[in-house]
Amino acid sequence: MTSLSTHIANENTLSVFIQRFERALREAFYEQADINQLSLQRGLPAAVWTRIMNEVPLSVAIPTEYGGRGSIVKECLALLSAASYESLPLSLTFGINIALFLEPVSKYANEQVKAPIFDRFLTQQSMGGLMITEPDYGSDALNMRTSYRTAGEDYRITGTKHWQGLTGQADFWLVTARGQLPNGELARDIDFFITDNAVPAQQIKVERLYNNLGLYMIPYGLNTIDIQVPAQQRLVAESTGIKMMLDILHRSRMQFPGMGMGFIKRMLDEAIGHCSQRMVGSSNLLALDSVQFQLSRIQAAYTICSAMCHRSSHISGIANNLAMEGIEANAMKALVTDLMQESAQLCLQVSGANGYKISHIAGRGIVDSRPFQIFEGSNEMLYTQIAEMMIKKMRKGKEPNLAAFLATYDLTRDASAYFKDTLDFAPGEGLMQRKLVDLGKIISRVIAASYVLALANDGFRDDLVTGSIEHLRRDIAHLVSNLYLDSRVKVIDDYVTGSDWLSFT
């Protein structure tokens, strides 16, 4: 009896769960099929999906009382990391399901609708996604036109959504809409509704699929919504719907490092492996100083992303309300996605011509990681918001000097000493947006340095910590120099006249 109990307990440990999942990925991508060839086509064969989903990976985001593993952030990030080491689109597929459907349902859905939904995820390999973006309202989600009204005991929802990951593939959706007011206007607040594609009245029509540039595994498209859902499928906000949306999106952004972790590690492993084997004269590529610098950049990204995962595991669980944690959520999402793109670019660069193939992990990685810098808030917008929120805090605290303020701010206090000389200036008010973007990048990197130091305190190896801090100091010094440049160059709309070089040759 004791032996059986021990066996069951071992089977339930995270390490065993992840090992089984990784084995399923190897079988699906290297034995059943060839991941490099699969990456040339859209979607995945049913047999490959079945092998992967047989391990019930999405159980990590389902509460234990419904048969899941407990919605533990550490486990969710470990799953995302394991998936992204082999396939970034697969990891994003799981990220959409976890952060944009299962976690919101766990936290905000009525109890009577949870059990059947979670059961289908556990036993029928169901999937879910989130619909916010509309053709005319991308980042301007608060002005969305999708609307709802009461229809007896139900809600009637109409509108148009697009660029939702898993378009036509998800079984469930969280659809965002604004209530119709008696005067014909739409309410300012936003509500979320669960839809079930198995119910005819709740089916969302796919008008067309898009030919997305990368992430071939994930279908995107244009959706027309004209559905009727029961009242109990409306999510219940703790205060306002907008704050619920912020909580959901901030949690999602804080879990981006899980998708970045395995991806960056794969770029690092591929780059080191290639440079170790590629001979130039009597030495391999690792003998070149420029190559050492490039690979150390990827290694710094690996360390920073590890620290972000460590931090996210402690703060982004569904028990916490993250609606007011915009600085931290934006900093994590924007910086880690920039690091993902840079790591892929560097891996391709050292791989030479072989990397310039969609069937090569680095070439594919550039195209697949690029949209991460755009969706869920473009990075320029997020960096701008970080800077604006920080300037507001500095104004409220009556501390104009950036270094002095960061030395007292809880997210940067531990790392501020490393940058005190570089950041010994007052940003001032009325910065141009391009300067706000630079300031946001600076702040996000100081926050990341604090994460790295916190991870070091828990035993992470010192040489990786030292290298990552050095690269962060270099990046911040470069960004500060940009702040001092009085660049006000703007685009010239009518640039053609007098600019044809042939006329002067």
Predicted segments with their positions:
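Amphipathic, small/basic residue-rich leader segments at the start of a protein or domain
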Residues: 1-96, 108-109, 113-123, 421-505
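Glycine-rich beta->alpha junctions and the first turn(s) of the following alpha-helix
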Residues: 206, 210-301, 370-379, 388-456
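A short, Trp-centered hydrophobic/proline-enriched beta-strand micro-motif
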Residues: 123-132
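Alpha-helix capping/hinge segments and adjacent helical runs
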Residues: 326-414, 481, 485, 491-493, ...
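A structural signal for short hydrophobic beta-strand segments in well-ordered beta-sheet cores
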Residues: 146-149
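N-terminal glycine-rich flavin-associated loop
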Residues: 92-112, 138-141, 276
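C-terminal helix-coil-helix/basic helical segment that borders enzyme active sites and/or dimer interfaces
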Residues: 36-37, 303-335, 348-349, 454-457
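A short core secondary-structure module
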Residues: 158-204
